[in-house]
Amino acid sequence: MTDPRVVSLAPSATATVAALGAADRLVGVTNHCDLSDDADAGSAHGIGSPTAVGGWLNPDLDRVAGLDPDVVLTSDGLQADLADACRERGLDVAHREPSTLDEVVEGFATRGADVGRPEAGERLAADARERLDRIADAVADRPRPTAYCEEWSDPPMAAGNWVPDAVRAAGGRYPFVEPGERSREVDPAAVERADPDHVVVHVCGHGDRVDPAAVAERDWVDAPVHVLDDSLLNQPSPALLDGVERLARLLHPEAFSVAGADDRP
C-alpha cells in the first residue's frame, strides 16, 4: 500500500502525526507547525521537507490542492469552515474536534487511522492512558490544591476544553470552567474568591515567554505563578500528557521528590 500524501493544517495534528512516526508522509504543513526535530518529514514522497501552505486559519488552499493530498488534517472548531472549504474543492478532510482529555487521547488512535498508521495510533493512545494512570497513582489520597489556568491575559481568560480535566488528572481542583467548555473571560473577583493555591499561565502563541512577575503584581492574584510553554496545555497533541505531568509536579512536588527531576511519574 502506498503511503498517503498528508497535508496538516493544524499544529496539534502535525505534532500527533510526528509522534505516530508518520511525519515522512507529510507533504504540506502550516507556518506554525514545528517539525524541527523530525529529519524524515516528507521523505516518503521524495521531498526534502513539507511545503509551507500558510497560516493555520488562512492557508493558501490553491497550494494545498496543488500538493495532491490523499487527506487533509484539520482540528478545532475554529477550523470547521476551513475544513468545509477544503471539501468543496474535492479534498478528503479528516476534521477532529476534541474538547476533553479523554477525547484527546482517543483522538491519537483516530489520527493513526487517518494517516494509515492505525496500530501506531492505538499504541500512542495506550501509552497516554498508562501515563495518566501513573499520575493518578502518584497523587492519590493527597489534598487537592486549587489551580487557576490562564490561556490569555488581555483580557484574562480561564482555560477550558481539556485543561479542567488536565488539572484534575494532576491532582488539583479547577472551579473556573467545566471540562469540555470553551475557554472564557474570567471575572478577577471570581478568581480571588476561589483563592487558588497556584496560578498557571500558558498564553496562546507566547511559548513560555511570559513574565510571571507581571502576573503576580495583579491585586487579585495571591499565589505562586508558574509559566508553562503554551504547547503543553493548549494543543490536543501528545505534548498535553507532558503538560499533565508538569501540572502534577507543580501541585504535588512531594509526590515526585524521590524520583529524578526529569523522570516521569
Model features per residue range: what roles?
Residues 1-265:
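N-terminal ligand-binding lobe of clamshell/alpha-beta domains
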